[in-house]
A protein has these predicted regions:
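Tryptophan-anchored aromatic micro-motifs
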Residues: 19-32
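A short, structured loop/turn motif at beta-sheet edges
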Residues: 18-22, 56-63, 171-179, 209-214
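Gly/Pro-enriched, hydrophobic low-complexity segments
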Residues: 170-180, 185-203
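Extracellular-facing segments of soluble proteins and assemblies that are Gly/Ser/Thr-biased and enriched
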Residues: 71-130
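Short helix-loop boundary/capping segments
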Residues: 113-167, 186-189
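Amphipathic/hydrophobic helical signal segments and adjacent flexible N-terminal regions
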Residues: 4-16, 31-45, 60-73, 93, ...
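Short hydrophobic/aromatic-rich beta-strand segments that constitute the beta-sheet cores
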Residues: 26-28, 66-69, 95, 118-123, ...
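Hydrophobic/aromatic beta-strand elements that line small-molecule binding cavities or substrate pockets
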Residues: 42-44, 48-58, 68-70, 83-85, ...
Length: 299
């Protein structure tokens, strides 16, 4: 590919990613099918909707886009939702294993040539899943697809104990009305003995663009809380930069990580340095790095 063609393709890719941004109503639909065990009983299909979600570029460099999602609930409450970072020709991945443990993986320049990594983060900016793929622009279609392992989704992690890994094939497709996140998932029970697939699942999340006025409350909320979450991201980035495996302790004193970090929004000191120190203290308590006896952190 010539330099000009490569530059044009890169700009096409970035434009498609930015097309995910805006104010959206969303429908979420999931259904299980093809159980691998005849004794498995299919669970009821899942349906949910969100009246408004504000999605926007929070940071941008030549090869990176940080996109934050904010959920508007009942026109009165804002929920800091998930975040997705897009990195061009990224060579550093955190691959989910199981039991809140992610393995650091280095990729060669040959493997990632022309590819984008989508890094998906939880509401507290902790890792969720990461995958590589190539944006495709053909016949008026614009889409990206990747397969990667992930923790249980939020809709099931407190409801299910019969599987512990979801192998997700994610497909993001830009449409005239917004975008669609299609999923072909495998629900897997993973152990030292290997993987056992319980059932397949189809997911379809449809993002339909609505007027930005429906998301004004989210815009205002972010202006108030942006600086705090920039500090949180910076501390996570410092951990990721060490390029070591990561394990997150599920609970400390009956409090999960997101509760501890969200509490600091209002309770931390009023200077950036005090806030940063408080964030560092929380992360040091919950996050274990390296592979030395990491399973003890999740018992």
């Amino acid at each position: 590919m010539t330099g000009l063609a490569q530059s044009t393709k890169l700009e096409q890719d970035k434009a498609a990613i930015k097309d995910m941004c805006g104010c959206y109503s969303i429908t979420f639909d999931y259904a299980e099918f093809f159980p691998r065990d005849s004794n498995y009983t299919l669970h009821e299909p899942y349906h949910a909707k969100a009246d408004a979600e504000w999605i926007f570029v929070e940071e941008e460099t030549d090869n990176k886009l940080v996109i934050q999602h904010l959920l508007v609930v009942n026109d009165t409450v804002i929920v800091k939702h998930w975040r997705q970072d897009w990195l061009y020709e990224n060579q550093h991945l955190y691959t989910y294993d199981r039991d809140k443990h992610w393995d650091y993986t280095a990729l060669s320049t040959e493997v990632v040539e022309g590819q984008w990594t989508q890094k998906v983060f939880q509401v507290d900016d902790s890792p969720r899943y990461e995958g590589n793929g190539t944006w495709v622009h053909v016949d008026g279609q614009h889409y990206w697809e990747s397969t990667t392992d992930a923790p249980l989704p939020r809709r099931e992690f407190s409801q299910r104990s019969d599987y512990n890994v979801m192998k997700r094939t994610n497909r993001h497709a830009i449409t005239s009305e917004g975008w669609v996140h299609e999923q072909d998932n495998l629900k897997i029970l993973r152990s030292e003995m290997g993987d056992s697939v319980l059932v397949e699942e189809k997911g379809r999340n449809v993002y339909t663009r609505i007027d930005d006025s429906h998301c004004q409350l989210a815009m205002d909320w972010w202006e108030e809380h942006r600086d705090y979450w920039a500090l949180v991201r910076a501390e996570w980035d410092a951990l990721f930069a060490q390029q070591e495996d990561i394990t997150i302790t599920p609970k400390i004193e009956d409090k999960v990580l997101w509760q501890a970090l969200f509490a600091l929004q209002n309770e931390a000191g009023d200077t950036a340095e005090k806030v940063r120190e408080a964030i560092q203290e929380v992360l040091a308590s919950y996050v274990k790095q390296g592979d030395n006896d990491w399973r003890s952190a999740v018992e």
